[in-house]
Regions:
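Conserved N-terminal catalytic/coupling substructures associated with nucleotide/phosphate chemistry
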Residues: 10, 14-306, 312-426, 447, ...
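Short, Lys/Arg-enriched N-terminal segment that forms or immediately precedes the first helix
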Residues: 422-434, 504-521
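Short, cationic-aromatic polyanion-contact patches
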Residues: 489-510
Length: 537
């Protein structure tokens, strides 16, 4: 038996060890550096040893506010060494007033003196501007990353301004009259194609009753100036002649590629108008999108490698929301790993990877988007992104991936993957029972449970980016519908896919094993019979 003194000694030792750990953690917190150690797109260091010129300071701040905003530390060297703010710049209120007076329109920032390693530094917090900011002497800057990952300020040229304003939803470039274009640059054959699309793709049928001029005006394909009609950017994109688009809108290019390993099987670049390009790319896809059949009752249902609806919506989104001021092409690439659709211009202001499926629909080119909706090519609710995710989820495949998106382009990747037939049947049966498609949040949660197997509400909310309250409401409905099973109570409560799904998978696996065993038994019997016959001889 252990003596009481020994037990007390152990307790004291345990407490001492824990006390040392706590003290160590506290020391780490107390000595933790508040100022970052290196510069990024949103972090800038400025030396103030020689009293930084005010024009240079304002110029740096203009570049940051015209990009993503961020924090500027005055009194820190480029390598992160803290050298301190000059006495002339130690007044935060004076710094804020200086920046407001030296920017057009006036920029409001927050400044304060902070102390790091016993040295004072001026910290300036810079918001991302909702418009273009210039210095008072007319200098417009933006911020970018160099190849080595370090940031720099560069001029924002006049041709870049429309793209920036479009990304901030302050300008609709697609609604502008295209300089140099005339009505002769519109192709009558493309207008016929437009009418056919409206007729056969559930477009706005009232448009078919209009004359050509009325149709052009209704879709804002043309604008009147001084009594003369001129094509807009949208008009040229939809109805323009290919050679004139190449000349007047050289940014409106598209590429379709098929790559097998390092071999290029197809590489087609075009400047055709969008309606012709959509149809051409859809035809190309049919040749490179094999199908697998699934038994569903008495029927055999084809399952494509890539969902047709998801591909179509991804294509429409790429052309509809791209930045037409940037000289880059929309790229569709079918590779061994999957399908990639990339388009110039990052997400517009307010859209990011976490809120893709929840943010209110708004695009970079509202007039073009509206025309595509009324024609019948784009999702009328503006929720085409839901269709892209639905196209993968209903077949039990990995979710579409936007993680490679940057500030300069949006990149959608849809992975090649075998369909989960049991999961697909479960979704199909439920949708047949309801007489409608399942909501996107229900599909996201079912997909999360399919891949993760077992999750709590908090984990579901984190994986799907759905708020906990909404996630709980959706999950409980899925439990009531028999698609999800719940176990445990309160915080320990977790959820899995309905056992029916797993039972069906196990049954199929068992049937396969039994069939293989029967084949092996027959083979063994025949082999034994032949062996006996040979032995008799």
């Amino acid at each position: 038996m252990t003596s009481k003194r020994t037990q007390n000694t152990r307790v004291r030792l345990f407490c001492c060890k824990n006390a040392r750990k706590v003290i160590g953690l506290l020391l780490e917190v107390w000595t933790m550096r508040m100022i970052p150690k290196k510069e990024t797109l949103t972090i800038e260091f400025k030396s103030d040893i020689d009293c930084l010129d005010e024009k240079e300071l304002v110029s740096e701040i203009v570049g940051m506010t015209n990009t993503e905003g961020g924090v500027l530390y005055l009194g820190v060297e480029d390598n992160g060494d803290i050298t301190g703010v000059h006495k002339k710049h130690k007044d935060p209120n004076g710094a804020m007033a200086l920046i407001a007076n030296k920017t057009v329109p006036s920029l409001s920032v927050r400044a304060e003196i902070i102390e790091e390693e016993g040295i004072e530094v001026l910290q300036i917090q810079i918001p991302m501007s909702k418009t273009i900011i210039a210095t008072s002497d007319g200098k417009i800057q933006r911020r970018r990353l160099k190849p080595d990952g370090s940031p720099e300020n560069v001029p924002m040229y006049p041709y870049e301004i429309p793209g920036r304003l479009s990304g901030l939803s302050q300008l609709d470039y697609s609604a502008q009259i295209l300089l140099g274009a005339t009505m002769d640059d519109l192709d009558e054959n493309e207008r016929d194609r437009l009418r056919n699309i409206i007729k056969y793709r559930k477009g706005d049928k009232t448009l078919l009753e209009l004359t050509d001029e009325e149709l052009d005006k209704a879709l804002q394909l043309v604008k009147e100036e001084a009594g003369v009609l001129y094509p807009t950017v949208t008009g040229m994109l939809l109805l323009g002649k290919e050679d004139r688009i190449a000349e007047l809108l050289p940014t409106a290019k598209a590429v379709f590629q098929v790559l097998e390993g390092t071999k290029v099987r197809k590489n087609e670049q075009t400047s055709k108008p969008l309606l012709a390009t959509f149809e051409m790319f859809e035809e190309y896809m049919k040749a490179w999108n094999p199908e697998k059949e699934m038994e569903y009752g008495l029927f055999r249902v084809p399952i494509p490698e890539f969902s047709d609806a998801a591909y179509r919506e991804g294509l429409v989104n790429a052309f509809c929301h791209r930045d037409y001021t940037v000289i880059q092409a929309v790229r569709v690439a079918i590779e061994d790993e999957g399908l990639t659709i990339s388009s110039p211009g990052g997400f517009i202001e307010g859209v990011n990877l976490k809120n893709l499926l929840t943010v209110e629909p708004h695009g970079r080119n509202p007039v073009l988007a509206d025309a595509l909706k009324r024609i019948g090519l784009a999702e009328k609710t503006g929720r085409g992104i839901d269709r892209i995710f639905e196209g993968s989820i209903v077949f039990g495949r990995p979710l579409p991936d936007y993680s490679e998106t940057t500030s300069t382009y949006v990149k959608l990747f849809i992975q090649r993957a075998e369909p989960d037939l049991a999961f697909t049947k479960m979704i199909s049966n439920e949708e047949n029972r309801l007489g409608r498609s399942l909501p996107i949040n229900s599909l996201l949660i079912l997909s999360a449970l399919q891949s993760q197997r077992r999750l709590t509400i908090a984990e579901i909310a984190e994986v799907t980016n759905i708020g906990e309250i909404r996630a709980k409401a959706v999950v409980e409905k899925l439990v009531e519908a028999g698609l999800v099973d719940a176990s445990g109570n309160n915080k320990a409560r977790f959820y899995i896919l309905s056992s029916k799904v797993y039972k069906e998978q196990e049954l199929k696996q068992l049937e396969k094993q039994m069939a293989m065993q029967q084949q092996q038994a027959v083979f063994n019997a025949i082999t034994a019979e032949h062996r006996d016959a040979i032995m008799t001889l």
